[in-house]
Every structure is written in C-alpha cells, then in structure tokens.
Regions:
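Active-site HxH/HxHxD metal-binding segment of metal-dependent hydrolases
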Residues: 1-27, 31, 396-427
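Divalent metal-coordination and catalytic microenvironments
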Residues: 67, 134, 329
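Acidic carboxylate-rich catalytic motifs and surrounding loops in phosphoryl-/glycosyl-chemistry enzymes
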Residues: 19, 138-139, 178-190
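Core dinuclear metal-dependent hydrolase active-site scaffold
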Residues: 18-95, 189-232, 243, 247
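Feature captures hydrophobic
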Residues: 189-382, 389-393, 401
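Cap/insert and terminal regions of metallo-dependent hydrolase folds
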Residues: 73-176
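Cys/His-rich microdomains that often coordinate metals
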Residues: 387-390, 410
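Conserved C-terminal region and hinge/linker of Rieske [2Fe-2S] proteins, especially
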Residues: 35-40, 423-430
C-alpha cells in the first residue's frame, strides 16, 4: 500500500490489482501487452517485499528481475514460453562487511567471498531463466561523499563487494554465456524476439568502456564534483546534531512497534546498543522497552549513528531506517555472533501496518514437510530462511550446508543455523 499511496499523491488513480504469477493482457493505442509480476512476500526481500516484472508484446518477452530473488521461475515457461531478454541486478547495495568492527583480514576475506557469491547467485538465475540476452543492471551503487569514496570499486580491490557491469560480463563470458549486453542510461536496444537488431549508446563505445575501465576513478571524481551541490543541499535539510535527548523520541517511536511484534522481538532476543554522538540508548527487545544503559552493561549487537541522522528520520517519521540510514553506510556496527535478520526487519517495519505484516509472515513461515537428499544428507527441501529450494540452491561442503540464494549456512550435524539466531534446519545423515 505504500507505493499505491505515493502514486495516488502524484495523480495516478487507475490501478490493476493482481496476484503473484498471474498474467494479464493490457490493451492500449499501440497494441496489447502481456504483463505478469512474480511477487516475493518475505520481510527480508526489499522493504518487506520485492518483485520481478515480465512484459511481452507477443513477439519479444522481457523479464526485469531487478534485485528480486524468486523462489521459483516455473511461471515464466508456463505463461510465456521462455524469455528473450533478462535484466538483473548482480551487485546490490548493502553495508556488510564494511561497517562492522572486525579485523581487516577478516573483512577482506568476507568481502572477497561476498563479491563472488553475489555474481555466482546471479549466474544461477541466468542459467535458470535461459534468456538469449542478459543485461546486468540496477547496480552497483556509487558513493560520492568524500568519506565514502573508498567503497567504489575503482582501485583494484578484490574484496570490494560492488563489481561493475564489465566485471560481471567477463564472468558471464568465462562461464560460456556470450549474450551479455552493456547498457548505460540513454542506451537503446531494439529486439525482435531473440534477435538483437541494434544497440545504440548515447556516447561513443570507447567512451562507454572507459567509464568502467581506465577512466573509472576519474569518472567518479567528476561525478562527485557535479553532484556536490546536490549533496550539500540534501545535508542542509538534515536535522541539527544537537537538541533534546533522544531517549524519549526513540521510546515513543519504538515501544509501540515492539509491543506489536512478538515474533520479531523474540527473534532478536537481546538488548541492542544505539550510540548517537554523546548519547547512548538501549533498545531492550526482550522487555519491549527503550531505556538508558546500565553501568558496565555488555551488548551482543550495537550501532553508532550520527545524531543528526537519527533526528532527521525521527522528524520525518521515516518507516524504514534500513533504506534511509543503513544502506547509506553512514554508520558503524559491532556484534557478537552472527547476523540477526530479525533486527534489521524491525528497523524496516516502523509502522503498525508493516510490523503486523512482518510478524505475521514469521509466524506462518515454518513449512519443512518435504525432504531431499544432498551429498549423503537428508534435509528439508525449503530453506528455513526464505523458503528457497535447496535442491537448486543448496551446496554441501563437509558438514556445512550453504543456501546460495542468500549465503546462509547450517551445521548438518546439529541443524543449527551458523548465520543467524533461530532458523534450525531439519537434517540427518542418509
């Protein structure tokens, strides 16, 4: 409903309500268009949901998967008979491992692994879709703040998690996929079915390639210079760093959400430290309260965020701190143990409507009835995390099973999730 309300505010009032994987035909002055949305409902998919869009004019079929991660693609074949052009994200925005306090060697190892795993997962989807042409799109992010410029992949760092299109296209070629196309804003590709008629860039081809190769650092520096007034204006609109203590405003915002979210709060399972300049507050999820820290209190998870950012999202009644703060990478974090999916779900569900949806989803997401065999182990077919088909995405190495959809891992000897609290896997040796 968030998107619909925003569109209505812009003047749109004719909407076609649909369901997951249901094809519709829309008629207009230029002819008919078949449309289908593959919907993902999990709180961890985008801001509590994501989707892929399929369009066909009866001759050419395009699947814009963007950064969604569908659990099944059966409807592509059954409804459209295949895909000609596949647009997909291979290098999404995220903050791990860069913002975490950890040894540099560990950060480099995790970054290298994450860089390759993201491209491997995307290649798996490309193989499953089987389109003639693949257009890597929707990423990577570009960091223009001087203090964040090091996050761009422009200095040959194998641990950088934001590879660009040229890097991914080379990965495709290395694995036998020669149908990759490079497009930038303003590029026009003309297709008739699986036939590429033309590909036209807004600037000469050698200049396009230079942006991603020898001239990349200079391009980003020039881009940052052009956008500096825009960034300055945006920051001028932030709330001031100084002001009244933040304890009460955060308490007023968080406590009603905590009281309405048993699954999420119990899933988090411990108090979380929130440092904002000179002030520290504790979000005590087990007790559903926001409070001051106890002397010498230790925490399993903590964040340090500039107070002006917190005051801004509170002032603006922002429902999703993941989108506004965490994805900006303008924060630090520390933790003992693994990633806590429930914690970040809480921060993206700061409205009654959102938290009710997410809590309900977690309450229902426990189907583990089907069983498969993987490398000498019987395991439940659906991943305990987001229900991915482990027959497709599961990889066994020794006594560890990894779901390559999101990179979560389990100890096959115990069924314990090695990535996050909860989410046990039903498994046993064959």
């Amino acid at each position: 409903p968030d998107l619909k309300r925003e569109l209505e505010a812009l003047g749109f009032h004719r909407f076609l309500e649909t369901e997951d994987s249901v094809k519709h035909r829309i008629s207009g002055p230029k002819g008919d268009l078949d449309v289908m949305i593959i919907a993902l409902r999990a709180p961890a998919d985008g801001p509590i949901g994501d989707s892929g869009l399929i369009l066909s004019d009866g001759v050419t079929t395009i699947f814009n998967m963007n950064d969604s991660r569908p659990l099944t693609l059966d409807s592509l074949e059954s409804e459209f008979g295949g895909v000609d052009v596949h647009l997909t994200q291979y290098s999404g925005a995220i903050w791990y491992p860069m913002v975490y306090d950890m040894p540099q060697r560990a950060k480099e190892a995790f970054g290298t692994q994450k860089r390759q795993r993201g491209m491997d997962r995307c290649r798996q989807y490309i193989a499953d879709v089987g389109a003639t042409w693949v257009i890597p799109s929707a990423g990577p992010p570009c960091f223009l703040d001087p203090e964040l410029r090091y996050l761009n992949d422009d200095h040959g760092d194998p641990a950088n998690i934001f590879p660009d299109q040229m890097v991914f296209l080379e990965q495709l070629r290395m694995h036998g996929q020669d149908g990759g196309l490079l497009m930038i804003p303003g590029t026009v590709a003309d297709f008739t079915g699986s036939q590429l008629n033309s590909l036209t860039h807004p600037i000469p081809v050698d200049e396009v390639e230079k942006i991603f190769t020898t001239g990349k650092a200079d391009y980003i520096a020039s881009y940052a210079q052009r956008m500096a007034p825009v960034l300055a204006a945006e920051k001028a609109g932030w709330a001031p760093a100084a002001g009244e203590p933040l304890l009460e405003p955060i308490r007023a915002r968080f406590e009603p959400i905590m009281l309405a979210s048993d699954q999420i709060c119990d899933g988090i399972g411990y108090p979380v430290e929130l440092k904002m300049g000179p002030e520290t507050v504790v979000v005590d999820f087990p007790k559903r309260t926001v409070r001051e820290p106890i002397p010498d209190e230790k925490f399993r998870y903590g964040f340090e965020i500039a107070p002006e950012l917190v005051r801004t999202v509170l002032r603006d009644n922002e429902p999703d701190w993941v989108n506004t703060i965490f994805l900006s990478t303008r924060f630090r974090a520390w933790r003992v143990g693994g990633y806590n999916e429930y914690l970040y779900t809480f921060f993206k569900c700061l409205t009654d409507e959102r938290v009710a949806y997410a809590d309900g989803w977690f309450a229902e997401a426990h189907d583990d009835t089907s069983t498969i065999t993987l490398d000498g182990w019987e395991v439940q077919r659906r991943c305990p995390h987001l229900k991915a088909d482990l027959a497709r995405f599961g990889v066994v190495e020794g006594t560890t099973l990894t779901c390559n959809l999101h990179g979560w891992a389990w100890d096959l000897k115990t069924g314990r999730c090695l990535t996050s609290k909860g989410h046990p896997l039903r498994c046993s040796p064959t």
